[in-house]
Amino acid sequence: MTLPAILLLSGIILLGAYLLYGKYVFEKFNINDKNQTPSHQYKDGVDYVPSKPIVVLGHHFASIAGAGPIVGPIIAVTFGWIPAIIWILVGGIFFGAVHDLGSMIASMRNQGKSIGTIIKNNIGYKGKQLFMIFSFSTLILVIAVFADIIAKTFINNPGVASASILFIGLAVVFGTVNKFVADKKSLFIIISIIGVALMYYFVYLGMQIPFALNYELWLYILLAYAFIASVTPVSLLLQPRDYLNSFLLYGLIIFATIGIFYANPEIKMDTQVNITSENLGYLFPVLFVTIACGAISGFHSLVASGTTSKQIDKEGDAKVVGFGGMLIESFLAIISVAAVIILSREEYASSLSLKGPVTMFSDGLGSMMATLGIPEQMAVSFVALTVSAFALTTLDTCTRLARFTLQEYFEGAENPVGKQLSGNRYLSTGIVVVLSILLIRSGGFTTLWPIFGSANQLLAALALLAIAVWLININVNATFVLIPMFFMFTVTLTSLGIFAWKNFQEEAYVLSIIAAILFVLSIILIILAKKSLEQKPPIPEIGNSFK
C-alpha cells in the first residue's frame, strides 16, 4: 500500500466514524440544542463565554494537540507502523472521541465544572478530593516542564520567540475587535481572514527579527504571561490566540496531505511488528501509553471539562468540537507516522536517537512539502515553528485548568483561606505559578516527568469511570464507555506496576513510590465507584433529562 493510499483510507475511516458511530454516541448522550449550556446560564465574561463553534474548536484543538500527536506516534513506530496506525484509528474513534465528548457533555450537564465535580456528584466527596489532588499535581508538572521546554526553545531559536510574541499581540487585537463584531458573520469571516494572514506573515517576520534573552528571564516572562492568560477574560487572549494558532495546524495538515499525495514517497520501513523494545519495553502496555494524544489522552478530559465546556454556545456544537476535534487529532497522528516510515528501520532508529521526534517530523514533512515548490528549509522551519507554537498553548491552558482545579477543590469551604482560594482567581492563579516556579527551581520536574505518560492515561481511565457512573445513574446504557474504561484501566495499571518494579530495581525509589501511590489511587476510586452504584438507585438527570 502506498503512503497516499494509507492517508486517504485513514481519512475516509475517520470521516465515516464521525458520521456513523458519532451519530450513535450523540444519541446516547441525548445532545439537544434546547438545553441551556453553562456558557449562557453562568455567563460572566471571564470563564463562561458563549462562543462560535469554529472559535471553540480552534481553542479546544489547539489545547489538546500540542506536540502530543506528533511525538507519541513517532516513538511508537518502534513497535511497527502497522500496530501504531491501527491503534490510532481504533483508539481515536472508540476511545478518545467518546472520552473527549463524554467529558465535555458530562461537564455541561454539571454547571460546566470539571471531572472532579462529576466524581463528587456521582461517586462521592472523597473521590473528588483524591482526583483533584492527582489532576492538580499533574498540571503543575506539565506547566513546569513546558515552561522549561519553551524557554530553551526560545534561546535556541530566537525567531520562534519573536513570532510567539507577535502572535500574542495579534490575539489581543483580534479578541478586542471580535467583541464589537458580535454575531455579524460576514465581518467575523473578514477579521478571521486578516488575522490568519497576519499570523502567517508573523511566522516570516519573527524569523527576521529574532528576540534573544537568557533562560531565567524567559522563564519568568513565560510564567507571568501564563498568569495573565489565566485571569483575563477567555475571549480576550486565550481563546483568540488558540483560534488563530489552530490555523497553523490546519495549514500544516493541508500542506502535508497535498505534499504526500504529490510526492508519493516510497515506504521504506518494513512491516515487522516488534513485541518488545530494549528501550521502551513490551508492546503492551507501552504502545497504548506512548501514542496517547493520537488515540486517547486523559489531559483531554481536563480541557474538555475545564475551559471548553464553559464556551460551548449550543449543545450541538460539542459534536464537532469534542468528537470531531479528537478525530482531527488522530488524522494528524497518522500524518506523523507517515513522516517517518519513508525511512528504513535503521535510518529511523538512528534519527530517533540523534534528532528526536519533532525534528524527524519537521524534516520528513518538510521534504514532502518542498515538492510543491516551497523552499525545503522554509517548509522545515514552518513545521518546527508550528509545533513550538502549540507548546505555549499547552502552558497557558494548563495554568487556567490548574486554577479551576484549585478553586473547585476548595469550593464550599467554610474557612477564610478556603473561601479566598475558591473565589479569588488572582490568588489561586498566583499559587499555581509559585508552585510551578518552585518545582522548576528544584529540578524535580526532570525526575518526575518519566511517569507522566502512565499518569496521563490513568486520568483518561478515571474520566471514563466518572462518565460511566454518571450515565448509569441516569439510566443510560454505558457499555460504549465501560469497554474503553476497562481497557484503559488494564493498560494503566499494568504500566504503573511495571514502572514501579523497574524503578525499584534501579533504586529510583521516588518514582517507584509515586507509581505505587497512583496504582492504589485508581483502585480506591474504582471501589468508591462500585459502592456508590450499590448504594443509590438510578435517578433521572435533573434539568437536561435523557429520553
What are these regions (language model features)?
Residues Y125-I140, G324-S330, P375-A379, L392, ...:
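Loop-to-transmembrane helix boundary motifs in multi-pass membrane proteins
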Residues K23-V49, I75, I85, L89, ...:
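Flexible loop linkers connecting adjacent transmembrane helices
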Residues I260-N274, L327-D363:
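Extracellular/periplasmic helix-exit of transmembrane alpha-helices
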Residues I13-I70, Y282, V286:
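Membrane-interface "cap" regions at the ends of multi-pass membrane proteins
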